[in-house]
């Protein structure tokens, strides 16, 4: 299987998942604990980038997407989301209460207000998702 991880990084992650300490892994692999630490750190960075890439892909292919600005009251978001869905002809399989609950549990909000800019989107499998606002200019079709 193709992956972004090296064979050594995979070994380190597998052993960590089994509960081994970095020093124990170093002995098993015949390397230093510092090297194991670096391998693990770089593997986790690659995993984070892969997750972000997948989230970005889902966002690009989303059915409905709305931008939320810092300071916006989350109680106003469902109506905004439903209006956007209606505009593009998509039925949202969530109620207002479900969207608000999702935002409280997953979005960067505090006391009903967005702490930073983010997007709420409905992915290709009808799941609500939170993502970062894309700073890429929209591509204009000729």
Swiss-Prot record:
Keyword annotations from UniProtKB, A to Z: DNA-binding, Transcription, Transcription regulation
BP terms from Gene Ontology: DNA-templated transcription initiation
Gene Ontology MF annotations: DNA binding; DNA-binding transcription factor activity
Domain of life: Archaea
Pfam families assigned: Sigma70_r4 (PF04545), TFX_C (PF14601)
Family of this protein: Belongs to the Tfx family.
Protein function: Putative transcriptional regulator.
Name the record gives this protein: Putative transcriptional regulatory protein PF0535
């Amino acid at each position: 299987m193709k992956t972004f991880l090296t064979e050594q990084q995979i070994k380190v992650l597998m052993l960590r998942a089994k509960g081994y300490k970095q020093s124990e892994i170093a002995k098993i692999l015949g390397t230093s604990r510092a090297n194991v630490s670096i391998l693990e750190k770089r593997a986790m960075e690659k995993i984070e980038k892969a997750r972000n890439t997948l989230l970005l892909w889902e966002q690009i292919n989303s059915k409905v997407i709305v931008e939320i600005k810092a300071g916006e009251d989350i109680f106003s978001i469902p109506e905004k989301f439903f209006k956007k869905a209606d505009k593009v002809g998509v039925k949202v399989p969530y109620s207002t209460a479900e969207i608000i609950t999702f935002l409280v549990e997953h979005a960067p909000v505090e006391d009903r207000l967005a702490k930073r800019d983010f997007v709420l989107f409905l992915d290709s499998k009808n799941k609500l998702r939170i993502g970062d606002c894309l700073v890429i200019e929209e591509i204009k079709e000729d």
